[in-house]
Amino acid sequence: MNVAVHLVNPIPAAEQSMVQCGNVKLATYRWGNPNGPTLLLVHGYPDNHEIWLPLINQLATDFQIIAYDVRGAGASDKPQHRRDYRLPLLADDLQAVILAHSPNQPVHLIAHDWGSIQSWEGVTEPRLQKHLASYTSVSGPCLDHVGYWMSRKRPWRQVLGQLLSSWYIAFFHLPFIPQLAWRHGMAKLWPRFLRQVEGIRPVRVSRTQSEDGQHGVKLYRANFIRSLLTPRQRHTQVPVQLVVLTRDRFVKAHLFDDLPRWAPKLWRREVAAGHWQLLAEPSQLAQWVREFVALQEAGENCAALQKAQVHHQNL
C-alpha cells in the first residue's frame, strides 16, 4: 500500500543502497539527521517501505531513519521457495541491515503487522538484542507467543473471535489462489478495501503491489503452522513499547495479554484505531516514538509513559 498524503515539509529523497544477506539483496533507504538516534522501520504485508513515508516526514528532522523492503517486497529480491521466508532468515535480514547502517550504535526498531511479527524473531534472539535500543511493535505478535497463548485455557469467545478475524491466514495457505487473486485484480481493488474497511483516504496502488502480495503469502506459509503447533520460548530484555489498536479487525488485543511473561521491560499503549490507521495518520505514533526513544536515550520519563509501563504486580 502507498498512502498518498500531502506532506507539509516534504522530506528529501532517500539515500538508497542494497544490503546482501546470504543470497538475498535487500533494498534499504536512509533519511534524516545523521547525528540523531537511529530508527529502523520494518513494514508489514502487503506493503513495502513506502507505507512509512508519512511517519518519516514527522520524524526525519530529529532522527536518522532507515527502512528496508523485506524479502519478497518492493525492490528487494523475491525468493521463490517457501523455505526462504522462515523467521530465522528474516532475523538474519534484520541483523544485516543493522550492521550495514548502524554497526556501532543500537537502533530503535519500529515495526508493523508482518514487520512486527518477523522483528519479534530478532528481538528475542540473544545475538541481536545488543543491537536494539528499543522495540516499538504495532499490531504484530510473536507467533511463538501466540502458540503458547492458544495452548492455555482461554474463554471460547476469545479464541473464536481471533479465529474469525484470522480467516485470511487460511486463505493464504490455499495453493495458487492467493497469487492468482493478486495477479488478476486484487492489487487494483486494494485501495477500495482500505477505504471501506479502514476508512483511509487517499490511497493509491504501489507499483509493486501485485508482486508484494503474491510473494508475501510465503511469509504465512513458511511460519504460521510451524510456530503455532510447536512454539518456542522466546524471551527478550529489549525495552518494548507495545501499540495495541483496539479497532484492529485482524489482530485482537487479548493476544498480547501474556506478553509481560516474555518481555519484562514493557510499556503498553492503546488507541482506538484500525490496522493501518496509525501509519496513514501518524501524529500519535510519532509522539509515542519520540517519548519512548527519549526515555531510552536520556531517561526522560513522561507521565504518559509512566502510566503505560506494565509493572510486575500487574502480571
List the model feature ranges, each with a label:
Residues 29-77:
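Conserved HGGG/HGGXW glycine-rich cap/lid loop of the alpha/beta-hydrolase fold
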Residues 55, 122, 255, 288-292:
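Hydrophobic residues on the short alpha-helix immediately C-terminal to a glycine-rich phosphate/catalytic loop
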Residues 28, 94-98, 285, 289:
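Generic hydrophobic alpha-helical segments
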Residues 44, 113, 280-281:
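Active-site helix-initiating loop/hinge in glycosyltransferases
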Residues 2-14, 24, 47, 51, ...:
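Flexible "cap/lid" subdomain of the alpha/beta-hydrolase fold that forms the substrate-access gate
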Residues 264-315:
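Catalytic active-site module of serine/aspartate enzymes centered on a nucleophile-bearing elbow/loop
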Residues 33-34, 100-105, 296:
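Glycine-rich phosphate-binding loop signature in dinucleotide/nucleotide-binding domains
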Residues 22-30:
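A short loop-to-beta-strand scaffold at the N-terminal edge of the catalytic core in hydrolase folds
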